């Protein structure tokens, strides 16, 4: 059977990028050796969701350690990989890998080109005479989150808080790395994730999924644009969250081109989620609409 991305259902493998170990070459988990063709092709192809591809040299040591070498440095540079990026590899059974990059619990999105606007001296003087807070307020307005108008008006306050959580989610993740305790937590999480095959946790290995972490806001679950694009996801006003305790119906909202699911914190509480735990979200659709998300918690 072929998945929606065009690849047969070989299990994915996950690598946590470490600039000290993975900048020049990438060692592939030994447990994955069983899936490679024999003899091993000289080159492999890495593809990203935007359609770009990189040719890399496939090497095999005397200790039967398989790695990606020549060409890997360019892949690292072109994608701007940094420490603790999650690299999720989907193999086609021949010589190609579809690579998805996650950062701070969200898929890494393409960098938009910078637009430069020329401003005349007159405009500078005009802005200088105006309210010094005007520009700051404009930036805030551009980054405001627009939620779906669902439910009664007495729920608006909660949703506003959730929207704020969405906006600061990435910053919270970055800030959590400032302490020694935070670095140790991430190290434990990275070590535990290095050997994870996400499909073994899924109810149906053919279902699409995405990976979240417990380091983001506990009030909302964010589904990034790239996940929505990769799997062609469509949502109604609500979705069912399923775990080992049962099912919760939650409201769905929109933030720009992302989707957020509100009141996510109850899943954390009843599953006793701790900092550094990894969350695999399995998407279940009915008639091309996401009806449920089955949540699998991988303890650190």
Curated annotation (Swiss-Prot):
UniProt keywords, alphabetically: DNA-binding, Nucleus, Transcription, Transcription regulation
Biased composition (Acidic residues): 119-129
Compartment(s) where it occurs, according to its Swiss-Prot or TrEMBL record: Nucleus
InterPro entries to which the protein is assigned, alphabetical: B3_DNA-bd, DNA-bd_pseudobarrel_sf, Plant_B3_domain
TM annotation in the entry: none
Region (Disordered): 115-142
Pfam families to which the protein is assigned, alphabetical: B3 (PF02362)
DNA-binding region: 11-105
GO CC terms, sorted: nucleus
A GO term, aspect molecular function: DNA binding
Protein name according to UniProt: B3 domain-containing protein At5g57720
The organism of origin for this protein: Arabidopsis thaliana
């Amino acid at each position: 059977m072929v998945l929606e991305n065009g690849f047969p259902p070989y299990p994915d493998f996950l690598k946590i990028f470490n600039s000290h170990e993975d900048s020049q070459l990438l060692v592939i988990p030994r447990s994955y050796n069983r899936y490679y063709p024999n003899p091993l092709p000289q080159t492999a192809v890495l593809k990203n969701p935007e359609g770009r591809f990189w040719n890399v040299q496939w090497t095999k040591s005397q200790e039967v350690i398989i790695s990606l070498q020549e060409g890997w440095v360019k892949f690292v540079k072109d994608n701007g990989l940094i420490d603790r990026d999650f690299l999720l590899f989907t193999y086609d059974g021949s010589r190609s890998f579809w690579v998805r990059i996650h950062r701070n619990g969200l898929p890494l999105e393409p960098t938009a080109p910078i637009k430069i606007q020329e401003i005349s001296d007159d405009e500078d003087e005009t802005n200088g005479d105006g309210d010094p807070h005007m520009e700051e307020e404009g930036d805030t307005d551009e980054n405001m989150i627009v939620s779906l108008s669902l439910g009664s008006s007495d729920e608006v306050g909660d949703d506003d808080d959730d929207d704020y959580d969405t906006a600061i989610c990435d910053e919270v993740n970055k800030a959590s790395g400032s302490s020694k305790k935070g670095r140790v937590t991430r190290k434990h999480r990275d070590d535990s994730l290095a050997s994870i095959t996400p499909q073994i946790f899924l109810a149906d290995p053919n279902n699409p999924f995405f990976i979240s972490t417990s380091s983001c806001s506990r009030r909302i679950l964010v589904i990034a644009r790239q996940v929505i694009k990769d799997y062609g996801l469509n949502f109604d006003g609500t979705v069912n969250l399923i775990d080992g305790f049962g099912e919760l119906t939650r409201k769905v909202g929109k933030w720009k081109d992302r989707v957020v699911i509100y009141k996510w914190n109850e899943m954390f509480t009843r599953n006793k989620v701790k900092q550094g735990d990894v969350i695999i979200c399995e998407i279940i659709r009915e008639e091309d609409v996401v009806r449920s998300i089955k949540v699998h918690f991988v303890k650190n």
